[in-house]
């Protein structure tokens, strides 16, 4: 009987925590860097998660699509966008089938560094010096 009560308490606690986690107010100013309105912010935050998952799963075509959207709509939202973008293009460079593809991916990688430099040049730890050092 005690174990049943314990199991029920844990189950109710888990349901309560999951319900709390879903109530994000995207109109909150702290999410402004993710987009122009609440719907765009929500979608860009999801795109950031999809980008990470696509890179981790080596689905580079999908990852490139998510990265493009994030760089256009919310370039200053998170450093992780650039970390995943750099990972994406470094892997694409290594997998390039010819010199033309390799040059295209190198150009894309340099573009990611340039946009990161514009968005995070004044970051205390990962600012301009760090970015330029990695770009070389």
Show which residues each predicted segment covers.
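Bacterial Sec-dependent N-terminal signal peptides
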Residues: 1-28, 86
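N-terminal leader/linker segments that initiate helical-solenoid repeat arrays
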Residues: 20-84, 88-107, 122-130
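Extended amphipathic alpha-helical interaction segments
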Residues: 117, 125-136
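Generic structural signal for well-ordered, non-transmembrane alpha-helical segments
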Residues: 107-110, 114
């Amino acid at each position: 009987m005690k174990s049943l009560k314990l199991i029920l308490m844990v189950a109710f606690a888990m349901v309560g925590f999951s319900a709390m986690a879903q109530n994000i107010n995207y109109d909150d100013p702290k999410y402004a860097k993710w987009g122009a309105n609440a719907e765009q912010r929500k979608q860009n935050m999801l795109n950031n998660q999809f980008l990470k998952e696509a890179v981790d799963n080596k689905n580079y075509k999908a990852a490139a699509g998510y990265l493009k959207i994030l760089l256009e709509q919310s370039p200053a939202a998170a450093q992780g966008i650039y970390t995943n973008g750099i990972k994406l293009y470094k892997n694409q460079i290594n997998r390039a089938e010819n010199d033309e593809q390799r040059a295209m991916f190198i150009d894309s990688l340099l573009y990611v560094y340039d946009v990161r430099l514009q968005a995070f040049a004044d970051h205390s730890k990962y600012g301009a010096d760090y970015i330029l050092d990695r770009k070389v």
